[in-house]
Amino acid sequence: MVNNEYQQLNTLVESDDEADLVIANLVKQLNELKQILVSLDNQEASATAVTDKKEEEYNQNQSSFHNFSKETLQKQAKRGFLLLERCSLVGLQQLELEYVNLLGRSFDSYQQKTELLNNLKELVDEHFSDTEKIINTLEKIFDVIGGSEYTPVLNSFFNKLLSDPDPIQREIGLRQFIITLRQRFKKLSQKIDSSLKQIETEAKIATEQVQNSEVMFGPPDIANDHELNLNWPDSETDAILSSMENELEAALLAKHQEEPPLIVTPPSLIKPTVSQPEVEVVTPTNNTNFQPQVDLKPTDLKKQQKKKPLNFITRPVFKSNLPPKLSKDDIVHYAHQLLEKNTHNE
């Protein structure tokens, strides 16, 4: 039955309703322990108020725990440890889980994340303070009981040594449990502090980057200025670009001055013909079965053009948008050809 309670209390809850029930139960048990502590403190105060008694009587009554029997103290020790295990350890697990969830969430601003981490750190500090009160009470009880000899048997879900038959092993397990619990609280607090410092550094870097980008690309801050001064001095980059632009303009101007003017002449109507190679066949005189050997000799282009005029007019191909300028002889020659063609057709 006890183990089932441990398993239920120490299982990480997933819904908010379950979390509220567990937290309410833990708070109830913690309040019960606080009432025990208050009653013990009152008895201790009444015992320490007696200062006029002898030193021996004062030493016997300096701790109110001596007024209880060992069986009662063992019972209260068990109860205190159960509260320590259920309230402190399970609550610590919830705080650790909440810290992991905060790291994985996205926030609208650094300020929002910082506020949540600060709130979590306050909860950790308060929970650790309550845990220390429980631990101090247990230490006082065990000091009065007599140490390991009267260490109660505790069915712990987290440390099996607390249920060991050997009382010395039970005391070792209890001290290990307390040391581990304190270390986990301190480690979680250190993690939160480290995250807060990291967020502060990231926010500072982001602010510096925004300021640098405003200096490089944005306009100057004129919130406090009445007039905008547009005559800002050129930067080094602007000076380099201006120098390059002047050099290019000077080079283009020098190039235009050196080049001669371009003269455009109208194209001729008759395209020059390409000379064809002359075929010369060489035949042997003695042998009748022979294969002709063709000797190709290119003729002179000028001689080929002087042999005879062309008997037809090719359609001119113009390489410009200007219309051709025909001479009078060309027009007369073209008219004669049209007459001959019409006569031939008739």
UniProtKB/Swiss-Prot annotation:
Origin: domain of life: Bacteria
Pfam family, one: MG491_central
InterPro entries hit by this protein: MG491_central
Transmembrane annotation, as ranges: none
Protein name according to UniProt: Uncharacterized protein MG218.1
Organism: Mycoplasma genitalium (strain ATCC 33530 / DSM 19775 / NCTC 10195 / G37) (Mycoplasmoides genitalium)
